[in-house]
């Protein structure tokens, strides 16, 4: 054939292929147009954390036996445990317990290996501050109960604001809340 005709046929095929690709990408764009937004307005709306979320550590002073297992299993030897040996009853008495959340990696080993379950992970994740020394929590600050995101009336949680279809096979968890 003539080189001009074959060049024109290749040009026509390339034009049709390009139009098909543009049409496919436009259809994908249109299919995403009717979705709900994934982003939230953070200070006023908060996502509900999952059940196994590892937030701030909660400490119960009365349950602690000062065994220092939490210090031994911590990869960075973070919890500071001060205790005194009571010779008359031959037991340790806990004097001070503190964790610096500026250094903590929230691995959860201390919670997992605690024999008396005096440590637990909370859903509290807003630990930001202007002074890093305020992140060093003692037993009083660690014993404070966390503020519940669901119970705060000033914050609209995503659970209440979006329509959620609960299926019979899937239990309701944070993945069904955030995946629209």
From Swiss-Prot:
It holds the Pfam family Fer4. One of its GO terms (biological process) is photosynthesis, light reaction. InterPro entries: 4Fe4S_Fe-S-bd, 4Fe4S_Fe_S_CS, NADH_quinone_OxRdtase_chainI, NDHI. [4Fe-4S] cluster 1 binds at residues 64, 67, 70, 114. It is an enzyme of class 7 (translocase). One of its GO terms (molecular function) is quinone binding. It is found in: Plastid, Chloroplast thylakoid membrane. Its cofactor is [4Fe-4S] cluster. It is a peripheral membrane protein. NDH is composed of at least 16 different subunits, 5 of which are encoded in the nucleus. NDH shuttles electrons from NAD(P)H:plastoquinone, via FMN and iron-sulfur (Fe-S) centers, to quinones in the photosynthetic chain and possibly in a chloroplast respiratory chain. The immediate electron acceptor for the enzyme in this species is believed to be plastoquinone. Couples the redox reaction to proton translocation, and thus conserves the redox energy in a proton gradient. Belongs to the complex I 23 kDa subunit family. This is NAD(P)H-quinone oxidoreductase subunit I, chloroplastic. It comes from Nandina domestica (Heavenly bamboo).
């Amino acid at each position: 054939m003539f080189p001009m005709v074959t060049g024109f046929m290749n040009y026509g095929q390339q034009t049709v292929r390009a139009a098909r690709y543009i049409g496919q990408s436009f259809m994908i764009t249109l299919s995403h147009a009717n979705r709900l937004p994934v982003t939230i307005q953070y200070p006023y709306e908060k996502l509900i954390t999952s059940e196994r979320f590892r937030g701030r550590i909660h400490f119960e002073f009365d349950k602690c036996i000062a065994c220092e297992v939490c210090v031994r299993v911590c990869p960075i030897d973070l919890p500071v445990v001060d205790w005194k040996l009571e010779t008359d009853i031959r037991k340790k008495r806990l004097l001070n317990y503190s964790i610096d959340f500026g250094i903590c990696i929230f691995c959860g080993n201390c919670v997992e290996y605690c024999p008396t379950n005096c440590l637990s992970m909370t859903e509290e994740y807003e630990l930001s501050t202007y002074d890093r020394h305020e992140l060093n929590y003692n037993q009083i600050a660690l014993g404070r109960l966390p503020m519940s995101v669901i119970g705060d009336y000033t914050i609209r949680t995503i659970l209440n604001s979006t329509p959620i279809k609960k299926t019979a096979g899937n239990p309701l968890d944070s993945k069904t809340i955030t995946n629209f």
